[in-house]
């Protein structure tokens, strides 16, 4: 007997899946080392990214499988190789548990170059036929992100792997309709692509450094002055006026990164475990 929709609805249970994670931050904050500590990672590197190679060279992380996608002179087909690699990871037999793109903002720039040269013949002008004619190029890029990139990430995720996208950061002026405008950290990607990836991700983690200040009284009137004597490296897990963020796990708003990528990963795992235990206890008590 065929079950009705309502019978299927009542019988359905959520299937646990690994997370889709966007990690971004300032240069040198430790994004690659952080991601290298995820379970059984493989790194897909955009052209010119050397962070993982330096970490392996100096023994900061163990040897990790990687591939750099590089365009040859006058060529723009490396982005196709990247998409093929995603397909192979989604369908092939392997023991990788985490797929890291380092950095996805670099992959997006490679996509921009491909669209610019193949769809607009290298014309980045604002006149008709140009990449920047009423956002024509950005729209083509966005369409490819939606139809070619996200489905592949989801296919990898459905196979039981964690998807991690690393991005560089930049600041953006936010026009505030209720008060003064302000600056906010976001990913270094076109705004629409940034928004789409943030909506898609389960976690958006902003890695930042805050100075540790020491105050001293000096000069006329014992005026208080401050100097930096160290730094705190933090992972911000929620959205705020200062930075884009998100999580679906009830994480604290900030998690200590510690002094290494290993510490950062261990602290994230501990925070996830604590959050899950709190939810379980709350459910049992209700």
Q: Where in this protein do the model-derived segments appear?
A:
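Conserved P-loop
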Residues: 2-6, 11-101, 105-113
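P-loop NTPase motor core
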Residues: 103-193
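Hydrophobic/aromatic ligand-binding patch that stacks against planar heteroaromatic rings
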Residues: 32-35, 155, 196-197
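Short, well-ordered beta-strand core segments
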Residues: 41-43, 163, 204-206
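Surface-exposed alpha-helical segments enriched in charged/polar residues
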Residues: 84-87, 91, 151-155, 202
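Conserved GTP-binding G-domain of TRAFAC-class P-loop NTPases and closely related GTPase folds
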Residues: 172-286
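Glycine- and charge-rich intrinsically disordered segments
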Residues: 1-15, 19-22, 266-286
């Amino acid at each position: 007997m065929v079950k009705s929709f309502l019978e299927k609805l009542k019988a359905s249970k959520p299937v646990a899946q690994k997370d889709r994670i966007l990690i971004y931050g300032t240069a040198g904050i430790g994004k690659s080392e952080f991601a290298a500590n995820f379970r059984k990672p493989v790194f897909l590197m955009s052209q010119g990214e050397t962070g993982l190679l330096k970490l392996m060279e100096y023994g900061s992380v163990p040897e990790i499988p990687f591939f750099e996608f590089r365009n040859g002179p006058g060529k723009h087909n490396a982005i196709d190789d990247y998409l093929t690699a995603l397909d192979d990871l989604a369908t092939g037999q392997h023991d990788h548990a985490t797929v890291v793109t380092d950095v996805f903002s670099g992959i997006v720039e490679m996509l921009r170059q491909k669209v610019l040269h193949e769809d607009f013949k290298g014309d980045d002008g604002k006149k008709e036929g140009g990449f920047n004619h009423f956002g024509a190029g950005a729209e083509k890029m966005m369409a490819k992100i939606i139809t070619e990139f996200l489905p592949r990430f989801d296919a990898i995720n459905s196979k039981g792997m964690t998807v991690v996208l690393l991005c560089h950061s930049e600041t953006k002026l936010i026009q505030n309709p209720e008060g003064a405008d302000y600056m906010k950290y976001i990913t270094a990607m076109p705004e629409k692509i940034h928004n789409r990836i943030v909506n898609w991700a389960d976690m958006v983690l902003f890695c930042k450094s805050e100075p540790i200040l020491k105050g001293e009284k000096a000069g006329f009137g014992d005026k208080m002055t401050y100097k930096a004597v160290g730094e705190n490296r933090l992972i911000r897990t929620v959205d705020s006026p200062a930075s884009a963020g998100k999580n679906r796990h009830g994480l604290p708003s900030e998690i200590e990164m510690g002094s290494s990528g290993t510490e950062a990963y261990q602290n994230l795992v501990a925070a996830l475990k604590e959050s899950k235990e709190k939810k379980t206890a709350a459910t049992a008590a209700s």
